[in-house]
């Protein structure tokens, strides 16, 4: 026997659980004990035997990068837990706290939470954090006696509320076996209900933690999707545009930005004019599907995302670019602004090579990067001007094109002060 160290990633744990449930059951009385090393060896052997290495053999360069995009999108979640606090703050502000938004009444987050759990959003968040704390003590949160978390009679921390929360975010063995999402179902349903004993076990403390960033958004989305309409994506898109207006009002002068009036053919959403350069913004609120954010991504879903969001955005930006390039001499950057978050927007740009390599004026930017940019515009003018200058150089230089991530990294811009202080609802 040779003892060697093997790599086990956080997403491997979910896959091991999924494969165990998919290919076996827990009805037998006998229990086979194995060491962690033996389990990992069994998993690696099975994974290698089942791995389809042919699915990219005839794939295009775009599909290769879209595969990398899906793989890194899953990995990114485990490498940057701060993003979940930021995501919570952003979602909470857009869905709940920003009372002055023009389209505030489009989506009712309070009704969505009350419909599912029967209590307020604040109570929902409190129960979520309590369940996470219970899971940090024991992977079976419902085994905890009520007196551990219920200290007064008026508290929301009751056995019933804790149980209902865990059950709502649970999946059975049959759910996992039958779902087209496979292992990915555990990101939205991180508790597993066992066949034997009907116990509820946290698949991973990390994916329970991820509910902090995603839970409220998913509750509201699912509430409206059950009505069988496109109400949520359409109306959340309007709220996303309201959020961009809010950012502009917060950090820019009134004459530095405008909402672009739409004609027969839809163009870009916003124009920002900073004097030495202009930014055309087309905002897209759609998220990359869960079946793409994994180590073997669903390329059909990935292709749909690019067709409906990236390619369509580019067409809209081109229409507006033709109009505004005739109105002024300062250079114009076309910005596809995404609500979703990615570890590196360069991968998105390489995933539609024919567009981004053929147009050095077009960039992908996440909402986090945009928040940071406008914050610097008001609070660190010198650094903001350096960013604009580097974007202009990128657009006009004969050398290969760079991307927003690389520009920020070069300037050591990592922190996002916008979602701190008054915008930090997690600490309130």
PLM ranges: what are they?
Residues 238, 242, 264, 311-314, ...:
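Conserved structured core elements
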Residues 249-273:
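A short acidic/basic microdomain associated with nuclease active sites
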Residues 260-263, 337-341:
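Short His-Asn-centered micro-motif
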Residues 261, 283, 293-294, 347:
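A generic "cationic amphipathic patch" detector
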Residues 265-268, 287-290, 341-346:
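Flexible loop/turn segments at secondary-structure boundaries
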Residues 285-337:
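Catalytic cores of nucleic-acid endonucleases
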């Amino acid at each position: 026997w040779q003892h060697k160290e093997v790599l086990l990633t956080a997403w491997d744990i979910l896959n091991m659980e999924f494969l165990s449930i998919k290919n076996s059951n827990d009805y037998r009385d006998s229990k086979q004990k194995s060491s962690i090393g033996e389990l990992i060896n069994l998993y690696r052997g099975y994974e290698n035997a089942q791995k389809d290495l042919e699915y990219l053999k005839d794939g295009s360069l775009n599909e290769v990068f879209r595969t990398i995009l899906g793989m890194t999108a899953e990995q990114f979640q485990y490498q940057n837990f701060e993003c979940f606090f930021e995501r919570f703050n952003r979602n909470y502000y857009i869905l709940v706290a920003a009372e002055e938004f023009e389209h505030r009444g489009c989506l009712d987050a309070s009704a969505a939470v009350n419909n599912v759990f029967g209590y307020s959003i604040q109570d929902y968040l409190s129960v979520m954090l309590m369940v996470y704390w219970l899971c940090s003590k024991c992977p079976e949160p419902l085994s905890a006696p009520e007196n551990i978390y219920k200290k007064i009679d008026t508290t929301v921390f009751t056995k019933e509320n804790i149980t209902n929360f865990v059950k709502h975010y649970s999946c059975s063995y049959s759910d996992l076996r039958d779902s087209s999402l496979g292992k990915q179902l555990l990101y939205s349903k991180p508790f597993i209900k066992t066949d034997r004993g009907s116990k509820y076990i946290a698949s991973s403390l990390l994916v329970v933690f991820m509910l902090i960033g995603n839970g409220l958004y998913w509750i509201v989305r699912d509430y409206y999707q059950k009505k069988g309409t496109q109400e949520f994506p359409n109306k959340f898109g309007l709220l996303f545009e309201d959020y961009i207006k809010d950012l502009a009002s917060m950090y820019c002068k009134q004459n530095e930005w405008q909402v672009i009036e739409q004609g027969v053919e839809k163009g870009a959403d916003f124009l920002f004019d900073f004097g030495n350069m202009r930014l055309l913004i087309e905002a897209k609120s759609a998220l990359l599907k869960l079946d793409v954010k994994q180590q073997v991504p669903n390329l059909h879903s990935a292709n749909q995302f690019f067709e409906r969001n990236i390619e369509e955005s580019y067409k809209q930006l081109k229409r507006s670019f033709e109009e505004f390039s005739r109105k002024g001499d300062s250079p114009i950057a076309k910005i596809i602004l995404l609500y979703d978050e990615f570890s590196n927007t360069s991968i998105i740009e390489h995933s539609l090579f024919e567009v981004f390599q053929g147009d050095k004026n077009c960039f992908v930017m996440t909402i986090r990067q945009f928040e940071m940019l406008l914050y610097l515009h008001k609070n660190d003018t010198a650094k903001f001007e350096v960013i604009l200058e580097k974007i202009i150089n990128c657009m006009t230089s004969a050398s290969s094109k760079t991307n927003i991530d690389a520009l920020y990294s070069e300037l050591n811009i990592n922190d996002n002060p916008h979602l701190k202080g008054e915008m930090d609802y997690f600490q309130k």
